[in-house]
From Swiss-Prot:
Peptidoglycan polymerase that is essential for cell wall elongation. Pathway: Cell wall biogenesis; peptidoglycan biosynthesis. The gene is mrdB. It comes from Haemophilus influenzae (strain ATCC 51907 / DSM 11121 / KW20 / Rd). It is a multi-pass membrane protein. GO terms for biological process: cell division; cell wall organization; peptidoglycan biosynthetic process; regulation of cell shape. This is Peptidoglycan glycosyltransferase MrdB.
Length: 371
């Protein structure tokens, strides 16, 4: 029977690759590279660097897909501990960039440990809860939340409010999908609402408060705090239906738009490709998210279901936060557009998370045989 299956298909199956998810990731990466080339001002150096990032990302994804989920259950505590130690090292010997100490420079490589933590936190929480009867007990829920808060606080003091929110959200999605009590969710929401004034007065930095106030009235300081948002909205709005054309955007090409290759690359896409480009982008993202949710629903274990579901939901949050930020409906928090913005650590970390998804999906037959 196996002889009747085409050779290329047999190779594909043995590599433990989910075809549809692979196609979605390839499509969003290709579109992102097209826009990035324009956003960088046709910089061959940046484009070549992106090619290396993409190759490394796909290699990491493919490698992670080869190992069964039980392998990640075993290494999760070590990965969590490594991420935690790296965050401490950032505070001690980290490299400062744009007023924030977020990077580790080892000479041969420079990376953000917070990106590793985005993967390690939901994995560790999923292992902890997935090995216990669900829904979790109250004590187990509090232990899981403590696992989330420790690295979140270390990221927040860098300071990196946007990433700290995403790290906490990635872990909380796991707790929620594990069956967290609705009463506890309500209590958490009320507690968070009460904590906001304290955070505003004592924990947030001046520039973070300025970003929130700027969101409410960016025109108040058009050449200062409101500059980013206003230029981004001008770029998106001027794109119209079909855009101004590839590499024809005035806001990006004339350097009015800040950070066009990272946080504000969506504005470049909107200006040059218009509403049509936006719909294409959203269709690809939706395709990836739906495929991820399908993998979560069809997973054979509690660990697989809650981890795949949380990974997919946090990917959606990345997309939502970046587009909301660039469109002026959310504060600017420095969250890149996933798999689209320039940035090696972020790209590889997200591809690694999709490698986990492929592992959960393509190795599920092993669980069925054991059961």
């Amino acid at each position: 029977m196996e002889d009747k299956i085409p050779f290329w298909l047999r190779v594909w199956q043995r590599l433990h690759i989910d075809f549809w998810l692979f196609i979605g990731l390839l499509a969003i990466t290709a579109y992102g590279m097209l826009v990035l080339y324009s956003a960088s001002g046709a910089s061959e150096t940046m484009f070549n660097s992106r090619i290396i990032q993409v190759l490394l990302g796909f290699i990491v994804m493919l490698l992670m897909a080869q190992f069964p989920p039980r392998f990640y259950q075993r290494i999760a505590p070590y990965l969590y501990l490594i991420g935690f130690v790296l965050l401490i090292l950032v505070d001690v010997i980290g490299t400062t960039s744009k007023g924030a100490q977020r990077w580790l420079d080892l000479g041969f490589i420079r990376f953000q440990p917070s990106e590793i933590v985005k993967l390690a936190v939901p994995l560790m929480v999923a292992v902890y809860l997935g090995n216990r009867p669900l829904p979790p007990k109250l004590s187990e829920t509090f232990i899981a939340i403590a696992m989330i808060l420790l690295p979140t606080l270390l990221v927040a003091i860098q300071p990196d409010l946007g990433t700290s929110i995403l790290v906490s959200a990635s872990g909380l999605f796991v707790v929620f999908l594990a069956g967290m009590s609705w009463w506890l969710i309500l209590a958490a929401v009320i507690g968070l609402a009460g904590f906001i004034p304290i955070m505003w007065l004592y924990l947030m930095h001046d520039y973070q408060r300025t970003r929130v106030l700027t969101l409410l009235d960016p025109e108040k300081d058009p050449l200062g705090a409101g500059y980013h948002i206003l230029q981004s909205k001008i770029a998106i709005g001027s794109g119209g239906l079909s855009g101004k054309g590839w590499m024809q955007g005035t806001q990006s090409q004339l350097e009015f738009l800040p950070e066009p290759h990272t946080d504000f690359i969506f504005a470049v896409m909107g200006e040059e490709h218009g509403m049509i480009g936006f719909l294409i982008l959203m269709a690809i993202y939706l395709f990836i998210i739906v495929r991820g949710l399908m993998i979560a629903v069809n997973a054979q274990t509690s660990f697989g279901r809650i981890l795949a579901g949380a990974t997919t939901l946090i990917f959606f949050v990345y997309v939502f936060v970046n587009i909301g930020m660039v469109s002026g409906i959310l504060p600017v928090v420095g969250v890149p557009l996933p798999l689209f913005s320039y940035g090696g650590t972020s790209y590889v970390a997200i591809m690694a998370s999709f490698g986990l998804l492929m592992s959960i999906h393509t190795h599920k037959s092993q669980f069925m045989k054991r059961s």
